[in-house]
C-alpha cells in the first residue's frame, strides 16, 4: 500500500496513482487538495493522520466487515435450520417486511455510529507509542482466523437461538375440533427475529470501546425501532395480514420470554468467555492501551496521566528488555514492541508519581 502526499498541481498524478492520497493546503492552489482522499493544513499533521486516525479507521473498517457478515449469518442460518423442519418446501420463517428491514433499519444504526465514532485507545497513548500502528501491518483486527472465528460464533449463536425457540414453542399440534393453544409459524419467526436483533446489539456492544451517550441512543433506538415496527405492522391488517395481532399473542406467551431470556443468556456467556479468555491469555496492544488509559499499571491503580507518563518514562530509560513470561499482576508491564516488554519497578513508578 502506497501513500502519496503533495501540495501542488504537479503532485496530482502522484496523489491519484497512490492507494491513499493526501493533499496539503498551500500557496500553490487547491488542485492537490481537490484530488486527494484526505487533506491537511500542514505537513506536521501527517503523523496524527496516519498514526491516530489511520489506525482508528482501519480498526473500524475491520469491525464493520466482521459484524456485517456476523449479523447476516445470524439471520440466515435460522431460516436454513427451519428448512429441515419444513422439508425444504420454501416456506419462510420470517415475515417478509421484517426480514427486509433487518439490515437497513433494525441493525444498521449501531454499526454506523461505531464505524464513525469508536476509539479504542486515546490519541495521547497512540502518539506516545507509535508501535500501535503495527496493528495494521500485523493484521491484528482482521485476518482469516479472526473472520472464521466470527462466523463460527454466529453459527453457534444461531443454533442456540433457533433450537431454543423451537423447543419452547413445541410442535403446536392439536386435534380436530380442538381450539389451538400453541403458537404458529410467524409467532415462532418473530420470536426468533426479536432475539437475533437484540443479541446482535449485545454482540456489537462487546466490541464498543468508547461507549458514549450517542452510542447508547443508537443501541436503544434500534431495539425501540423494531418494537415500534412490530406493533405497527401487527395491528395494520392491510399491511401485515399474515401477522395481524401477532404481537398480542407473542408478547403474552411464556415461550417468548423464556426463549428470549435463556437464548440471550447462553449466547452472552459464550461471547463473554471468549472475550475474557482473549484479554487474560493473549491481550492485544489495544487491550493494554485501554488499561493504561484507565490508570492501571502492573496491577496497581494510578491516575490516568500518571500511568501513561510512568510507562513512557520508564520505557525510554530502560530500553526494550527480553520477553519473559507474564503473570496476572504484570499484564500492563508488557511493552508493545514485537512481543518484548519493559519491566517497570512498582517502587520507582510510585515514587515518580508522588
Name these PLM-found stretches.
Residues 1-3, 8, 12, 16-214, ...:
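Membrane-embedded transport module
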Residues 96, 126-127, 250-251, 256, ...:
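Generic detection of intrinsically disordered/low-complexity segments and helix-coil linkers/edges
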Residues 130-133, 267, 271-354:
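Non-transmembrane, juxtamembrane loop and terminal tail segments
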Residues 180, 234-257:
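Extracellular/periplasmic helix-loop-helix junctions in multi-pass membrane proteins
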Amino acid at each position: 500500500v502506497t501513500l502519496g502526499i503533495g501540495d501542488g498541481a504537479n503532485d496530482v498524478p502522484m496523489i491519484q496513482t497512490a492507494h491513499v492520497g493526501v493533499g496539503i493546503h498551500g500557496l500553490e492552489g487547491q488542485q492537490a487538495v481537490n484530488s486527494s482522499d484526505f487533506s491537511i493544513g500542514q505537513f506536521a499533521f501527517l503523523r496524527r493522520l496516519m498514526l491516530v486516525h489511520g489506525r482508528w479507521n482501519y480498526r473500524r473498517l475491520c469491525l464493520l466487515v466482521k459484524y456485517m457478515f456476523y449479523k447476516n449469518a445470524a439471520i440466515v442460518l435460522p431460516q436454513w435450520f427451519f428448512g429441515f423442519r419444513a422439508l425444504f418446501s420454501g416456506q419462510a420463517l420470517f415475515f417478509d417486511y421484517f426480514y427486509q428491514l433487518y439490515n437497513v433499519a433494525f441493525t444498521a444504526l449501531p454499526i454506523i455510529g461505531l464505524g464513525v465514532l469508536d476509539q479504542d485507545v486515546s490519541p495521547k497513548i497512540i502518539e506516545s507509542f507509535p508501535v500501535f500502528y503495527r496493528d495494521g501491518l500485523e493484521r491484528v483486527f482482521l485476518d482469516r482466523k479472526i473472520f472464521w472465528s466470527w462466523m463460527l460464533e454466529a453459527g453457534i449463536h444461531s443454533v442456540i437461538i433457533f433450537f431454543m425457540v423451537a423447543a419452547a414453542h413445541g410442535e403446536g399440534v392439536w386435534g380436530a375440533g380442538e381450539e389451538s393453544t400453541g403458537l404458529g409459524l410467524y409467532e415462532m419467526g418473530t420470536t426468533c427475529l426479536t432475539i437475533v436483533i437484540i443479541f446482535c446489539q449485545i454482540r456489537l456492544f462487546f466490541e464498543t470501546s468508547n461507549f458514549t451517550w450517542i452510542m447508547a441512543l443508537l443501541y436503544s433506538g434500534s431495539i425501540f425501532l423494531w418494537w415500534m415496527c412490530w406493533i405497527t405492522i401487527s395491528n395494520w391488517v392491510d399491511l401485515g395480514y399474515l401477522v395481524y395481532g401477532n404481537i398480542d399473542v407473542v408478547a403474552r406467551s411464556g415461550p417468548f420470554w423464556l426463549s428470549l431470556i435463556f437464548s440471550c443468556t447462553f449466547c452472552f456467556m459464550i461471547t463473554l468467555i471468549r472475550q475474557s479468555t482473549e484479554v487474560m491469555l493473549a491481550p492485544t496492544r489495544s487491550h493494554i492501551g485501554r488499561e493504561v488509559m484507565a490508570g492501571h499499571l502492573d496491577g496497581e491503580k494510578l491516575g490516568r496521566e500518571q500511568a501513561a507518563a510512568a510507562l513512557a518514562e520508564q520505557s525510554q530509560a530502560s530500553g526494550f528488555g527480553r520477553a519473559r513470561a507474564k503473570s496476572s499482576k504484570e499484564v500492563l508491564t508488557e511493552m508493545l514492541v514485537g512481543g518484548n516488554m519493559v519491566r517497570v519497578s512498582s517502587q520507582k513508578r510510585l515514587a515518580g508519581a508522588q
